[in-house]
C-alpha cells in the first residue's frame, strides 16, 4: 500500500513540475496549439460551407438540367407533332392532287372517246351515204336502161312529189 500512497514531498515536486510545465506550455506551445486548432476548425468549417455550397449548386444544376430536359422533350414533341401534321398535309395534298389529275384524265378520256365516237359516226354516215348513192345509181341505171322504164320512173316521181 505504500506504493500507492504518494508522499507529501513527492506530491509537492510533482505539482511544481506540473505547474512549470503548464507555464512553459502556456507561454510557448499553447498559442500555437490553439492557433492550429482554430485554423483546423476554420478549415473544417470552410470545407463544410464549401460542401454545402457545392451541394446547393449541384441541386440547382440538377434542377436546371431537369428543366432543360423537360424543355427539350417539349420541343422534341412539338417538332414531332409538326412533322406528323406536315406529313399528313403532304399526303392529303398529294392524294387530292392525284384525284384531281385522275378525274381530269378520266374526263379527257371520256371527251376523247365521245369525239372519236362522233367522228366514227360521221364517217360511217358518209360511208353509208356513199354506198347508198352507189347502190341507188346502179339501181337507177339498171331501171332506166329502157325508154319505157324512164317514163314510168318520171311519172312515179311526179306522183310522189304531188303526194308530199
Swiss-Prot record:
Record's subcellular location: Cell membrane
Record-linked Pfam families: ATP-synt_B
Family: Belongs to the ATPase B chain family.
Quaternary data: F-type ATPases have 2 components, F(1) - the catalytic core - and F(0) - the membrane proton channel. F(1) has five subunits: alpha(3), beta(3), gamma(1), delta(1), epsilon(1). F(0) has three main subunits: a(1), b(2) and c(10-14). The alpha and beta chains form an alternating ring which encloses part of the gamma chain. F(1) is attached to F(0) by a central stalk formed by the gamma and epsilon chains, while a peripheral stalk is formed by the delta and b chains.
Membrane-topology descriptor: Single-pass membrane protein
UniProt keyword terms in alphabetical order: ATP synthesis, Cell membrane, CF(0), Hydrogen ion transport, Ion transport, Membrane, Transmembrane, Transmembrane helix, Transport
Family matches, as Gene3D superfamilies: F1F0 ATP synthase subunit B, membrane domain (1.20.5.620)
Domain of life: Bacteria
Record's keyword annotation contains Heme: no
SUPFAM superfamilies: F1F0 ATP synthase subunit B, membrane domain
Family annotation (InterPro entries): ATP_synth_B-like_membr_sf, ATP_synth_b/b'su_bac/chlpt, ATP_synth_F0_bsu_bac, ATP_synthase_B_chain
An annotated GO cellular component: proton-transporting ATP synthase complex
Protein role: F(1)F(0) ATP synthase produces ATP from ADP in the presence of a proton or sodium gradient. F-type ATPases consist of two structural domains, F(1) containing the extramembraneous catalytic core and F(0) containing the membrane proton channel, linked together by a central stalk and a peripheral stalk. During catalysis, ATP synthesis in the catalytic domain of F(1) is coupled via a rotary mechanism of the central stalk subunits to proton translocation.
Protein name in UniProt: ATP synthase subunit b
UniProt-listed CDD domains: ATP-synt_Fo_b (cd06503)
Listed transmembrane segments: 8-28
Organism of provenance: Christiangramia forsetii (strain DSM 17595 / CGMCC 1.15422 / KT0803) (Gramella forsetii)
A molecular-function term among this protein's GO annotations: proton-transporting ATP synthase activity, rotational mechanism
Amino acid at each position: 500500500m505504500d506504493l500507492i500512497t504518494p508522499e507529501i514531498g513527492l506530491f509537492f515536486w510533482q505539482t511544481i513540475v506540473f505547474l512549470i510545465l503548464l507555464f512553459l506550455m502556456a507561454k510557448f506551445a499553447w498559442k500555437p496549439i490553439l492557433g492550429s486548432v482554430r485554423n483546423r476548425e476554420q478549415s473544417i468549417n470552410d470545407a463544410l460551407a464549401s460542401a454545402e455550397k457545392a451541394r446547393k449548386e449541384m441541386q440547382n444544376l440538377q434542377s436546371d438540367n431537369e428543366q432543360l430536359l423537360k424543355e427539350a422533350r417539349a420541343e422534341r414533341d412539338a417538332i414531332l407533332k409538326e412533322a406528323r401534321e406536315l406529313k399528313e398535309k403532304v399526303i392529303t395534298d398529294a392524294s387530292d392532287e392525284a384525284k384531281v389529275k385522275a378525274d381530269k384524265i378520266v374526263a379527257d378520256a371520256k371527251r376523247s372517246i365521245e369525239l372519236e365516237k362522233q367522228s366514227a359516226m360521221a364517217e360511217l354516215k358518209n360511208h353509208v351515204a356513199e354506198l347508198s348513192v352507189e347502190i341507188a345509181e346502179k339501181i337507177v341505171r339498171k331501171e332506166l336502161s329502157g325508154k319505157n322504164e324512164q317514163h314510168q320512173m318520171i311519172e312515179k316521181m311526179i306522183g310522189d312529189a304531188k303526194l308530199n
